[in-house]
């Protein structure tokens, strides 16, 4: 199942804790953890310092407490936990799916589940609030969508349209027809 994973599983960059200005990169591939650093200093004795790199297999990284400590210090405990899980083979396959595929999957969820999923990450929040998702949900729950309703959804948003009750929807459609009808009459 992991064969369709990209070669680079995770990559992040960061700056060392103050007062250090050193720059760091953490790269996790399918087989290795690569930790790179660049010394940034105004002092002349450090100007000729070359960048460094430490490469460890996943198994070696799990046993290397020094490199884990550096990772936690620079990138934080959450990143360290995530990298450890990647090294143990615990991949987040759901996060790696395309947006279109995720939108199709999410459209089959109950509304309560969509609300919970929206709270899990920035990416899922963006997907759960997207007009594309709510258009799919409206299309699956409604028999037909008239051009007037589609135009109203383009103006107000599909999510807003979904949560609007029928009486309010009829009122909004009437107002929209009057507004655009008056505009057409005024045009020569």
Curated annotation (Swiss-Prot):
Q: This protein is called what?
A: F-box only protein 36
SUPFAM superfamilies documented for this protein: F-box domain
Q: Report if keyword ATP-binding is assigned.
A: no
Q: Which cysteines are joined by disulfide bonds?
A: none
| Known partners and oligomeric status | Directly interacts with SKP1 and CUL1.
Record's function text: Substrate-recognition component of the SCF (SKP1-CUL1-F-box protein)-type E3 ubiquitin ligase complex.
**Keywords of this entry:** Ubl conjugation pathway
Among SMART domains, the record links this protein to: FBOX
- InterPro entries (alphabetical): F-box-like_dom_sf, F-box_dom, SCF_F-box/WD-repeat
Q: Does the keyword Hydrolase apply?
A: no
**Domain F-box spans what residues?**
91-137
């Amino acid at each position: 199942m992991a064969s369709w994973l990209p070669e680079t599983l995770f990559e992040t960059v960061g700056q060392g804790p103050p007062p250090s200005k050193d720059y760091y990169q953490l790269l996790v591939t399918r087989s290795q953890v690569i930790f790179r650093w660049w010394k940034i200093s105004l002092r002349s004795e450090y100007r000729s310092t070359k960048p460094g790199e430490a490469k460890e297999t996943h198994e070696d990284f799990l046993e290397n407490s020094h490199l884990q400590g550096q990772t936690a210090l620079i990138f934080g405990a959450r990143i360290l936990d995530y990298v450890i899980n990647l090294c143990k083979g615990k991949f987040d396959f759901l996060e790696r799916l395309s947006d279109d595929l995720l939108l199709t999957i999410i459209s089959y969820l109950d509304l309560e589940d969509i609300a919970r999923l929206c709270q899990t990450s920035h990416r899922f929040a963006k997907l759960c609030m997207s007009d594309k998702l709510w258009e799919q949900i409206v299309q699956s729950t409604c028999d037909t969508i008239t051009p007037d309703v589609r135009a109203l959804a383009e103006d107000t948003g599909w999510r807003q349209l979904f949560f609007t009750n029928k009486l309010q929807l009829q009122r909004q459609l009437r107002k929209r027809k009057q507004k655009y009808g008056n505009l057409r009459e005024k045009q020569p």
